[in-house]
Protein backbone atom coordinates (compact mmCIF):
# COMPACT_ATOMS: atom_id res chain seq x y z
CA UNK A 1 0.00 0.00 0.00
CA UNK A 2 1.32 3.46 -0.86
CA UNK A 3 1.93 6.06 1.82
CA UNK A 4 -0.66 8.82 1.98
CA UNK A 5 0.26 12.26 3.26
CA UNK A 6 -1.30 14.74 0.83
CA UNK A 7 -3.52 14.25 -2.18
CA UNK A 8 -4.68 16.78 -4.76
CA UNK A 9 -7.30 15.91 -7.35
CA UNK A 10 -10.59 16.86 -8.93
CA UNK A 11 -13.42 17.06 -6.41
CA UNK A 12 -16.67 15.25 -7.22
CA UNK A 13 -19.88 16.46 -5.53
CA UNK A 14 -22.02 13.37 -4.86
CA UNK A 15 -25.01 15.22 -3.42
CA UNK A 16 -26.79 12.10 -2.20
CA UNK A 17 -27.20 10.73 1.30
CA UNK A 18 -27.58 7.16 2.54
CA UNK A 19 -25.42 5.72 -0.24
CA UNK A 20 -25.14 2.04 0.64
CA UNK A 21 -22.63 -0.50 -0.59
CA UNK A 22 -25.10 -1.99 -3.08
CA UNK A 23 -25.39 1.43 -4.72
CA UNK A 24 -21.60 1.83 -4.67
CA UNK A 25 -21.16 -1.54 -6.40
CA UNK A 26 -24.11 -3.82 -7.22
CA UNK A 27 -23.91 -7.46 -6.12
CA UNK A 28 -23.60 -8.70 -9.70
CA UNK A 29 -20.00 -7.39 -9.72
CA UNK A 30 -18.94 -9.32 -6.62
CA UNK A 31 -18.17 -12.60 -8.37
CA UNK A 32 -14.54 -11.80 -9.17
CA UNK A 33 -11.84 -13.40 -7.07
CA UNK A 34 -9.27 -10.63 -7.56
CA UNK A 35 -9.07 -7.28 -5.78
CA UNK A 36 -8.91 -5.22 -8.97
CA UNK A 37 -11.07 -4.50 -11.98
CA UNK A 38 -14.15 -3.19 -10.16
CA UNK A 39 -14.21 0.33 -11.63
CA UNK A 40 -16.89 -0.55 -14.19
CA UNK A 41 -19.27 -1.52 -11.39
CA UNK A 42 -18.84 1.70 -9.41
CA UNK A 43 -22.23 3.42 -9.10
CA UNK A 44 -23.20 1.36 -12.15
CA UNK A 45 -26.96 1.71 -11.77
CA UNK A 46 -26.66 5.49 -11.57
CA UNK A 47 -24.00 5.86 -14.26
CA UNK A 48 -25.91 3.76 -16.79
CA UNK A 49 -29.46 4.92 -16.07
CA UNK A 50 -29.04 8.60 -15.20
CA UNK A 51 -27.34 10.75 -17.87
CA UNK A 52 -27.16 13.61 -15.35
CA UNK A 53 -25.29 11.55 -12.75
CA UNK A 54 -22.21 13.46 -11.62
CA UNK A 55 -19.66 10.95 -12.97
CA UNK A 56 -21.25 11.23 -16.42
CA UNK A 57 -20.17 14.88 -16.48
CA UNK A 58 -16.82 15.12 -18.28
CA UNK A 59 -15.54 17.70 -15.76
CA UNK A 60 -15.83 15.17 -12.91
CA UNK A 61 -15.02 11.95 -14.77
CA UNK A 62 -11.37 11.89 -13.61
CA UNK A 63 -12.18 12.90 -10.05
CA UNK A 64 -10.23 11.48 -7.14
CA UNK A 65 -11.85 13.24 -4.15
CA UNK A 66 -15.48 12.18 -3.65
CA UNK A 67 -17.53 14.61 -1.54
CA UNK A 68 -20.55 12.58 -0.43
CA UNK A 69 -23.64 13.13 1.67
CA UNK A 70 -24.18 11.70 5.15
CA UNK A 71 -24.34 7.97 5.86
CA UNK A 72 -21.97 6.88 3.11
CA UNK A 73 -21.10 3.18 2.85
CA UNK A 74 -24.02 1.79 4.84
CA UNK A 75 -25.47 -1.66 4.20
CA UNK A 76 -23.56 -4.90 3.92
CA UNK A 77 -19.84 -5.14 4.51
CA UNK A 78 -18.27 -5.11 1.05
CA UNK A 79 -14.58 -4.61 0.63
CA UNK A 80 -15.53 -4.52 -3.05
CA UNK A 81 -17.10 -1.07 -2.49
CA UNK A 82 -13.73 0.30 -1.40
CA UNK A 83 -11.93 -1.55 -4.19
CA UNK A 84 -14.34 -0.11 -6.79
CA UNK A 85 -13.77 3.44 -5.52
CA UNK A 86 -10.00 2.95 -5.62
CA UNK A 87 -10.04 1.24 -9.03
CA UNK A 88 -12.04 4.15 -10.46
CA UNK A 89 -9.37 6.54 -9.17
CA UNK A 90 -10.69 7.86 -5.87
CA UNK A 91 -8.12 8.36 -3.13
CA UNK A 92 -10.41 10.18 -0.68
CA UNK A 93 -14.08 10.11 0.30
CA UNK A 94 -15.37 13.01 2.39
CA UNK A 95 -18.68 12.72 4.26
CA UNK A 96 -20.29 13.88 7.48
CA UNK A 97 -21.03 10.26 8.49
CA UNK A 98 -19.69 6.89 7.39
CA UNK A 99 -20.82 3.40 8.23
CA UNK A 100 -18.26 2.05 10.70
CA UNK A 101 -17.48 -1.06 8.67
CA UNK A 102 -16.98 0.94 5.47
CA UNK A 103 -14.62 3.34 7.25
CA UNK A 104 -12.62 0.38 8.58
CA UNK A 105 -12.44 -1.33 5.18
CA UNK A 106 -11.40 1.95 3.56
CA UNK A 107 -8.48 2.56 5.91
CA UNK A 108 -7.20 -0.99 5.52
CA UNK A 109 -7.21 -0.65 1.72
CA UNK A 110 -5.57 2.78 1.50
CA UNK A 111 -8.69 4.87 0.86
CA UNK A 112 -9.04 7.87 3.17
CA UNK A 113 -12.59 8.15 4.56
CA UNK A 114 -12.46 11.59 6.19
CA UNK A 115 -15.33 12.90 8.28
CA UNK A 116 -16.31 16.56 7.97
CA UNK A 117 -19.09 18.75 9.29
CA UNK A 118 -22.16 18.59 7.03
CA UNK A 119 -22.15 22.39 6.68
CA UNK A 120 -18.59 22.17 5.29
CA UNK A 121 -19.62 19.35 2.93
CA UNK A 122 -22.40 21.56 1.59
CA UNK A 123 -19.99 24.47 1.10
CA UNK A 124 -17.66 22.15 -0.83
CA UNK A 125 -20.57 20.90 -2.95
CA UNK A 126 -21.42 24.49 -3.83
CA UNK A 127 -17.80 25.27 -4.78
CA UNK A 128 -17.45 22.11 -6.88
CA UNK A 129 -20.74 22.68 -8.68
CA UNK A 130 -19.87 26.31 -9.42
CA UNK A 131 -16.40 25.35 -10.66
CA UNK A 132 -16.57 21.86 -12.21
CA UNK A 133 -13.12 20.29 -12.28
CA UNK A 134 -11.90 22.30 -9.29
CA UNK A 135 -8.90 20.84 -7.47
CA UNK A 136 -9.24 19.71 -3.86
CA UNK A 137 -6.18 19.16 -1.67
CA UNK A 138 -6.47 16.80 1.28
CA UNK A 139 -3.65 16.92 3.82
CA UNK A 140 -3.60 13.96 6.18
CA UNK A 141 -0.74 15.59 8.08
CA UNK A 142 -2.75 18.77 8.71
CA UNK A 143 -6.17 17.06 8.69
CA UNK A 144 -7.45 19.71 6.30
CA UNK A 145 -9.28 19.93 2.99
CA UNK A 146 -8.51 22.93 0.78
CA UNK A 147 -10.55 24.03 -2.23
CA UNK A 148 -10.06 27.37 -3.99
CA UNK A 149 -8.53 29.01 -0.93
CA UNK A 150 -11.09 27.72 1.57
CA UNK A 151 -9.75 25.39 4.26
CA UNK A 152 -11.93 22.90 6.11
CA UNK A 153 -10.94 20.56 8.96
CA UNK A 154 -11.70 16.85 8.92
CA UNK A 155 -11.54 13.99 11.39
CA UNK A 156 -9.88 10.62 11.03
CA UNK A 157 -8.87 8.49 14.00
CA UNK A 158 -5.19 8.49 14.95
CA UNK A 159 -4.63 4.79 14.23
CA UNK A 160 -6.06 4.94 10.69
CA UNK A 161 -4.15 8.16 10.05
CA UNK A 162 -0.90 6.50 11.15
CA UNK A 163 -1.53 3.41 8.98
CA UNK A 164 -2.27 5.53 5.91
CA UNK A 165 0.74 7.80 6.45
CA UNK A 166 2.98 4.75 6.87
CA UNK A 167 1.36 2.91 3.92
CA UNK A 168 0.52 -0.13 6.04
CA UNK A 169 -2.19 -2.60 5.12
CA UNK A 170 -2.71 -5.73 7.26
CA UNK A 171 0.15 -7.57 5.54
CA UNK A 172 2.44 -4.57 5.99
CA UNK A 173 1.60 -4.45 9.69
CA UNK A 174 2.44 -8.13 10.04
CA UNK A 175 5.73 -7.76 8.15
CA UNK A 176 6.82 -5.07 10.62
CA UNK A 177 6.89 -7.88 13.20
CA UNK A 178 8.85 -10.29 11.01
CA UNK A 179 11.83 -10.46 13.41
CA UNK A 180 9.58 -11.12 16.43
CA UNK A 181 7.68 -13.79 14.50
CA UNK A 182 10.94 -15.50 13.49
CA UNK A 183 12.19 -15.37 17.11
CA UNK A 184 8.93 -16.90 18.34
CA UNK A 185 9.12 -19.67 15.74
CA UNK A 186 12.75 -20.37 16.72
CA UNK A 187 11.68 -20.86 20.37
CA UNK A 188 8.80 -23.19 19.56
CA UNK A 189 9.32 -26.83 20.54
CA UNK A 190 10.24 -28.99 17.55
CA UNK A 191 7.32 -31.38 18.12
CA UNK A 192 4.80 -28.60 17.32
CA UNK A 193 3.76 -28.04 13.69
CA UNK A 194 5.45 -25.29 11.71
CA UNK A 195 4.38 -23.23 8.74
CA UNK A 196 6.41 -23.41 5.55
Swiss-Prot record:
One of its GO terms (molecular function) is 3-isopropylmalate dehydratase activity. Pfam families: Aconitase_C. One of its GO terms (biological process) is L-leucine biosynthetic process. The keyword Phosphoprotein does not apply. It catalyses: (2R,3S)-3-isopropylmalate = (2S)-2-isopropylmalate. Its EC number is 4.2.1.33. One of its GO terms (cellular component) is 3-isopropylmalate dehydratase complex. Keywords: Amino-acid biosynthesis, Branched-chain amino acid biosynthesis, Leucine biosynthesis, Lyase. Pathway: Amino-acid biosynthesis; L-leucine biosynthesis; L-leucine from 3-methyl-2-oxobutanoate: step 2/4. InterPro entries: 3-IsopropMal_deHydase_ssu, Aconitase/3IPM_dehydase_swvl, AconitaseA/IPMdHydase_ssu_swvl, IPMI_Swivel, LeuD. Catalyzes the isomerization between 2-isopropylmalate and 3-isopropylmalate, via the formation of 2-isopropylmaleate. Heterodimer of LeuC and LeuD. Belongs to the LeuD family. LeuD type 1 subfamily. This is 3-isopropylmalate dehydratase small subunit. The lineage of its organism: Bacteria, Bacillati, Actinomycetota, Actinomycetes, Mycobacteriales. The gene is leuD.
Amino acid sequence: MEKFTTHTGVGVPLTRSNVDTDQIIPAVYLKRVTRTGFEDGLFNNWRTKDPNFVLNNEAYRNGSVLVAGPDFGTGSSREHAVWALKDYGFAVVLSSRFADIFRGNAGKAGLLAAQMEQTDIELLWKQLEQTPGAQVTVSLEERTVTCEGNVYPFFVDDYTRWRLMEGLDDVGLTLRKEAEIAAFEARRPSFKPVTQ
